[in-house]
Amino acid sequence: MLSCTTSTMPGMICKNSDLEFDSLKPCFYPEDDDIYFGGRNSTPPGEDIWKKFELLPTPRLSPGRALAEDSLEPANWATEMLLPEADLWSNPAEEEDIFGLKGLSGSSSNPVVLQDCMWSGFSSREKPETVVSEKLPGGCGSLAVGAGTLVPGAAAATSAGHARSGTAGVGRRKAAWLTELSHLDSECVDSAVIFPANKRESMPVATIPASAGAAISLGDHQGLSSSLEDFLSNSGYVEEGGEEIYVVMLGETQFSKTVTKLPTAAHSENAALTPECAQSGELILKRSDLIQEQHNYAAPPLPYAEDARPLKKPRSQDPLGPLKCVLRPKAPRLRSRSNSDLEDIERRRNHNRMERQRRDIMRSSFLNLRDLVPELVHNEKAAKVVILKKATEYIHTLQTDESKLLVEREKLYERKQQLLEKIKQSAVC
């Protein structure tokens, strides 16, 4: 829970923990039982969701970080409580890059970049008032962005002054910042400024005047350093000697870029600036290829130049030689396969020829057998089974007739022998 310094009583710092609930009581629903039944002091949860989450603007650079950079003194308890969670745990530039709030400074007249959407300490029945347009003290450097130009902040100019001021200046800045923050509690910001996702408009592009050169506050460029380094790594190449410079701004769904031609006089002025300004000027992208957004698949594709497309290398005919060598070992295999096929075809052809010869011989034998059977001599349409059956019966009859003839032959032979003996006896007598 946030500290009681963000309550409806500006300028008051509560050190008693029992008074925190009293100061933050307007943030909660009434304690009546009829909260959802139209009580006297109740508000339906769906009446206006933006009234439940009223917004309080916070500076782009947190007070704890700004004071820690200037002095070696540890921040007090009030500064630690007022420090947003985004500054405590992560880089605010990365958080702005995730929620798409980095391009918010170019679309609104508010110089304060809003970070914490849930920092609210006043009643839900109060209407949001106008956007805070007044700047914070010089200790917190900010980048005031107009409709078309970038105004350099005070962080780069006052960095040397902070080193010379000492602890007395730090105490004055703390008190001034807390006083200014207490006066900002009574005002809130419209939700359309915080969540521009519903607006599908391209963000205005900020340009750098030639007279100003690259004199942009270092604190503002630190938020863009991470994304610019990613773009430099993703881009193809960077030319060192060109005069055309790409200034890239992170918008809602795509990157808007402008080409600003800086004369040689601007380069001479940049050479005379402080090392901090020179370091911030180096962060500006020089002449490079078109930058494509990597993970935004919903964004329309960027137009590509025909020269940027990689040309396909023509296929050379040199690899054909090794391919022929690779195909050569397959030739014997094809020959063996063709030989085996020819052998199979020849074998089948011989088998068919022998089968036809066997069938012809069998047919001729059946026809001859049919002619030998007396009953089937004139029957040309006799079946093979009938021919075989009748031939078998005829053979049996022939065998019986043969046996009878053999018996008769034996009888005749015996008769012959008897007659020869009678002739011999008659001759002796």
From Swiss-Prot:
<dbReference type="InterPro" id="IPR012682">
    <property type="entry name" value="Tscrpt_reg_Myc_N"/>
</dbReference>
<comment type="subunit">
    <text>Efficient DNA binding requires dimerization with another bHLH protein.</text>
</comment>
<dbReference type="GO" id="GO:0000978">
    <property type="term" value="F:RNA polymerase II cis-regulatory region sequence-specific DNA binding"/>
</dbReference>
<dbReference type="GO" id="GO:0006357">
    <property type="term" value="P:regulation of transcription by RNA polymerase II"/>
</dbReference>
<keyword id="KW-0597">Phosphoprotein</keyword>
<feature type="domain" description="bHLH">
    <location>
        <begin position="346"/>
        <end position="398"/>
    </location>
</feature>
<dbReference type="GO" id="GO:0006915">
    <property type="term" value="P:apoptotic process"/>
</dbReference>
<feature type="region of interest" description="Leucine-zipper">
    <location>
        <begin position="398"/>
        <end position="419"/>
    </location>
</feature>
<comment type="function">
    <text>Has apoptosis-inducing activity.</text>
</comment>
<dbReference type="GO" id="GO:0005634">
    <property type="term" value="C:nucleus"/>
</dbReference>
<keyword id="KW-0053">Apoptosis</keyword>
<keyword id="KW-0238">DNA-binding</keyword>
<dbReference type="InterPro" id="IPR002418">
    <property type="entry name" value="Tscrpt_reg_Myc"/>
</dbReference>
<dbReference type="InterPro" id="IPR050433">
    <property type="entry name" value="Myc_transcription_factors"/>
</dbReference>
<dbReference type="Pfam" id="PF01056">
    <property type="entry name" value="Myc_N"/>
</dbReference>
<dbReference type="InterPro" id="IPR011598">
    <property type="entry name" value="bHLH_dom"/>
</dbReference>
<dbReference type="InterPro" id="IPR036638">
    <property type="entry name" value="HLH_DNA-bd_sf"/>
</dbReference>
<feature type="modified residue" description="Phosphotyrosine; by Tyr-kinases">
    <location>
        <position position="36"/>
    </location>
</feature>
<dbReference type="GO" id="GO:0046983">
    <property type="term" value="F:protein dimerization activity"/>
</dbReference>
<feature type="region of interest" description="Disordered">
    <location>
        <begin position="301"/>
        <end position="325"/>
    </location>
</feature>
<protein>
    <recommendedName>
        <fullName>Protein S-Myc</fullName>
    </recommendedName>
</protein>
<dbReference type="GO" id="GO:0000981">
    <property type="term" value="F:DNA-binding transcription factor activity, RNA polymerase II-specific"/>
</dbReference>
<dbReference type="Pfam" id="PF00010">
    <property type="entry name" value="HLH"/>
</dbReference>
<keyword id="KW-0539">Nucleus</keyword>
